[in-house]
Design a protein with these regions (language model features):
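Acidic, polar-rich low-complexity tracts and alpha-helical solenoid repeat scaffolds
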Residues: 2-5, 17-178
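Sec-dependent N-terminal signal peptides
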Residues: 6-13
């Protein structure tokens, strides 16, 4: 069995330790205020860079924990996930928001967004191109959407989101009845 010189072994060990201590992913937001993080996240959202907005909103949620800004970050993260095509993550984020903040003034929006995520789950590009209607697709998402819209209309009849939710409920009922 070959013997390695002690100096070579020491050099390899030192290089390994240095590599382990290196931080390849420095946090560019380390010195930022919550307002700056929020502004950057909004810029990414407005520019359609949803994949860049999500990590910023996650950082904001952690740094502003327990504040209305953290709640706003959760909702905007769900929106970014939805628009970025991460629908399952958006629903999970909204479910978490609703569990943690049942008395939030934005609870109606959370229900509406959850309804939209599931509603549009059935309206993908393939379905549109094939002219396939809602009654021919998996109906679980439609039922979940209907339930979110129904809860919104029942609990928040005066919400600004309720009229659109009712229209979408009618569409779902008519589509499933075909």
């Amino acid at each position: 069995m070959p013997r390695f010189p002690l100096s070579l072994l020491s050099a390899l060990l030192a290089a390994g330790l240095l590599a382990a201590c290196a931080s390849p992913n420095e946090d560019k937001t380390a010195g930022w205020s919550t307002d700056k993080i929020y502004a950057e996240a909004r810029d990414e959202l407005n520019g359609g860079a949803y994949d860049k907005a999500v990590p910023l909103l996650e950082k904001l949620e952690g740094r502003a924990a327990g504040t209305p800004l953290a709640q706003q970050a959760q909702l905007e993260k769900a929106y970014a996930q939805y628009k970025g095509g991460e629908k399952a993550q958006a629903v999970a984020t909204l479910d978490r928001f609703m569990k943690l903040h049942p008395a939030s003034p934005a609870f109606d929006y959370a229900l509406y967004l959850k309804g939209l995520v599931n509603f549009n789950e059935n309206l993908g590009l393939f379905s549109w191109l094939s002219r396939q209607d809602l009654s021919e697709r998996d109906q679980k998402a439609a039922k979940d959407s209907f339930e979110s819209f129904r809860e919104l209309a029942t609990r928040f009849p005066e919400s600004r989101y309720t009229p659109d939710a009712r229209l979408r409920m009618t569409y779902i009922i008519n589509s499933l009845a075909q």
